[in-house]
Amino acid sequence: MNVAIVKYNAGNIYSVVNALRRMSIEPLLTDDAEQLQKADRVMFPGQGHAAEAMEYLKARRLDEVIRDLKQPVFGICVGQQLLCKHSEEGDVDCIGIFDADVKRFQPQKHEDKVPCMGWNKLSLPQSLQNEGSVNPLYKGILSPLPLEGSREAFVYFVHSYYVPVCQHTIATADYILPYSASMHKDNFYTCQFHPEKSGKVGEQIIKNFLEL
């Protein structure tokens, strides 16, 4: 399988490269439009400042390239945020796949720290619980039925901005308020957390994406 990773001015990209190598996949790290279009799967990870990232992407017209991709695309961390309509981080318009805006966490109590950093539990949004369904990205991880103890899915987060729960949400987390831990629309899948740093749960999520 040919897996491409979008190369841009963001941190943490190489941790995703290493995660794929542990799965015996050698990804292509590229900002070339043709190579991204030809890939079987495209991953769009990263940590960084949304406005600076969008400036870089637009200067190379990568925002248009990403928007027009037809194969499964996986946005991770700031990659999820950049696929939204607008971000408060730098007050910038983003790629616009998801009709959602990115907000900054507003601490409500003294113990609320920003950035949110650490392990947190994934849950199904109420809409999917009502349907009794789970998105294929979370096959074997989440369930409409209550999960307890070791069957609960915990993943690793580091972020100061979040996407509110919306019609695209396929998994939620709760920090200060419930928010979109993961989203899906058409061929675009995202997560706010770092699957490459989330142990066996994260590895299974990446495998599920590659099998879409």
Regions from the PLM with identified roles:
Residues 68, 101-212:
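Amide-donor transfer/coupling interface in amidating biosynthetic enzymes
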Residues 1-4:
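Extreme N-terminal starter segment of soluble prokaryotic enzymes
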Residues 39:
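An anion/phosphate-binding loop that grips the pyrophosphate of nucleotide cofactors and donors
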Residues 11:
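Conserved Rossmann-like nucleotide-cofactor binding loop
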Residues 48-120, 126:
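Cysteine-nucleophile active-site neighborhood
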